[in-house]
Amino acid sequence: AFIDRSADWMVSRFGIGTGMMIADFGCGPGLYATRLARKNAIVTGIDFSNRSIQYARETAAREKLLVHYVHQNYLDFETDDRFHLILMIMCDFCALSPAQRKTMLSRFHRFLEPSGSVLLDVYSLNAFNERKERTLYEPNLLNGFWSPGKYFGFLNTFKYEKEKVVLDKYTIIEAQRTYTIYNWLQYFSPENVEREFSACGFAIESYFADVAGTPFSSQGREFAVVAKKQ
């Protein structure tokens, strides 16, 4: 499976082993944290989803793994620990605003040991070019994702060509209330990634097609970045 391949590549690329300190921002149910802790790394996983963190904690307890899970919005996460490697996977970086990205990268810089690394993935401009502006209306839009009860859902997708940003605006209409969710996604070129990282004290070491170390392709819908603290 991709996660196994990816974790194996990380182990060899970053020399992950006993005593290595790793932080996984947006760790979810611990898919990476669990695998890296099995290599005797000391892992911290941060995620906003209580259900995911509970599942991850149960897995760690069952396998007696050294993982510290934190149920928190990672934008608010603080620690005195210093890490050799920081992960942010599943293109989470793209969902942050420019100010949030700057905050995150500055924190990553502070949280890392000297010459520590960041590995993250982002959506490419190819993926941006594939996105279309559209309007969609559906009863129980996204198969009931937004509410356990009945509702009507509207999705409006807007593209911002200059900024390379896409907005998915969801309007959910229930019997008792109506609310709106704004999902912003930033799409990147390698040059834009490099600009943001170098402004926060990082040097880009390599680009890959994904977080399993597949060679970089300019045709891909996403790409991965390894950056080193300067």
Predicted regions and their residues:
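Conserved alpha-helix/loop element of class I SAM-dependent methyltransferases that forms part
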Residues: 2-18
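Conserved class I S-adenosyl-L-methionine
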Residues: 19-26
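Short glycine-centered segments of the SAM/dcSAM-binding site in methyltransferase folds
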Residues: 21, 116-117
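Class I SAM-dependent methyltransferase SAM/SAH-binding core
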Residues: 31-76
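A short acidic, Gly/Pro-enriched loop at the edge of an enzyme's catalytic core
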Residues: 78-85
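A short glycine-rich, Lys/Arg-flanked "PGG" loop and its adjoining helix->strand segment in the class I
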Residues: 102-114
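SAM-dependent methyltransferase
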Residues: 119-194
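C-terminal lobe and adjacent flexible extensions of AdoMet/dcAdoMet transferase-like proteins
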Residues: 190-230
